[in-house]
């Protein structure tokens, strides 16, 4: 029993130092040699949040967007001809190769055709996907990416600027677009992203969807992919479909609003007070117990191999 406890304690000591600590071969070996039961009980966000390099396996998105992992990840270069990656300290510029290719295509085409000077790219996924130590519930299988609604400057940002530069809000409040910030280039950028067939959904703040519903002409079917959701007032969130070869990846149901665009009842709901209303707390109710952390056991079985391969 002591032989199992000591490696587990050692591994916890390595992991609690956080994502800034460099992963070593010794750490990978410790994961690979732990007993299955001990490893499965560990918090998945600690295990995956400590990984610094991708799993040297064939590229596969495994599981669902909010419960899975990523094999064979590819990094989006931090600087490109039409993009720059932000918040480099997070080491979240990893994705399935299909996602990385799509971001590069969107950056290049929006600069060439849409009057968008270049993308500032936020989080994709961790090197091996999985739950994160902070932030997103999704972004676990390398098929999600955040793109800022701020144009790239005409120079290379310093690392310090990438950590501290604030993105520009494009809304005044939860119902109103800020017309002093919003431009037609914003609209063309989002339309281009939604028009790619591999894109499943794009999450935006409700007034952004409302503005695009007013702006769009001709074929408006791309609007169906735009889903209003909280917190997307300075960036939009691209989600692509499961790639070919990712046989255990789970797609979400296609976005098919009844009106064909989502500009009707669905948008009206998000522009109302209902989704934003705070529930009244019962003063006599006992405080709920916090949910236990997601463990490796809760993820698809393949994620253990993704985690432990050296």
Residue ranges and their predicted role:
Residues 126-179, 238:
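Acidic/His-rich structured neighborhood in mature extracellular/periplasmic domains
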Residues 25-66:
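Solvent-exposed N-terminal domain segments of exported/luminal and surface proteins
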Residues 48-51, 102-134, 203-225:
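Extended, low-complexity, intrinsically disordered C-terminal regulatory tails
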Residues 1-9:
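Bacterial N-terminal signal peptides that target proteins for export
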Residues 114-116, 140-144, 233-235:
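Extracytoplasmic
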Residues 56-121, 182-192, 196:
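Active-site acidic/histidine clusters and adjacent loop/turn architecture
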Residues 24-36, 40, 161-310:
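Catalytic cores and adjacent binding grooves of peptidoglycan-active enzymes
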Residues 17-19:
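N-terminal signal peptide c-region/cleavage motif recognized by signal peptidases
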């Amino acid at each position: 029993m002591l032989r199992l406890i000591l490696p587990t304690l050692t591994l916890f000591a390595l992991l609690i130092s956080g994502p800034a600590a460099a992963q070593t071969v010794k750490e990978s070996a410790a994961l690979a040699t732990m007993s299955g039961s001990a490893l499965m009980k560990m918090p998945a966000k600690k295990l995956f949040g400590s990984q610094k390099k991708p799993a040297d396996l064939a590229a596969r998105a495994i599981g669902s967007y909010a419960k899975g992992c990523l094999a064979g990840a590819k990094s989006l270069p931090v600087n490109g001809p039409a993009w720059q990656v932000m918040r480099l300290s997070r080491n979240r510029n990893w994705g399935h190769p299909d996602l990385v290719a799509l971001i590069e295509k969107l950056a290049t085409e929006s600069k060439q055709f849409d009057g968008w000077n270049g993308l500032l790219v936020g989080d994709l996924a961790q090197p091996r996907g999985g739950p994160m130590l902070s932030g997103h519930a999704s972004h676990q299988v390398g098929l999600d990416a955040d793109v800022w609604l701020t144009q790239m400057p005409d120079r290379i940002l310093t690392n310090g600027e990438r950590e501290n530069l604030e993105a520009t809000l494009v809304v005044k409040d939860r119902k109103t677009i800020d017309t002093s910030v919003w431009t037609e280039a914003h609209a063309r950028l989002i339309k281009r992203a939604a028009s790619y067939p591999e894109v499943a959904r794009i999450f935006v703040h409700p007034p952004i969807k409302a503005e695009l519903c007013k702006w769009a002409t001709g074929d408006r079917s791309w609007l169906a992919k735009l889903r209003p959701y909280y917190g997307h007032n300075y960036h939009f969130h691209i989600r692509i479909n499961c790639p070919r070869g990712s046989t255990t990846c789970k797609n979400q149901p296609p976005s098919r609003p009844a009106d064909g665009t989502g500009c009707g009842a669905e948008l009206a709901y998000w522009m109302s007070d209902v989704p934003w209303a705070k529930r009244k707390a019962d003063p006599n109710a006992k405080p709920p117990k916090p949910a236990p952390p997601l463990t490796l056991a809760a993820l698809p079985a393949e994620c253990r191999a993704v985690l432990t391969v050296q």
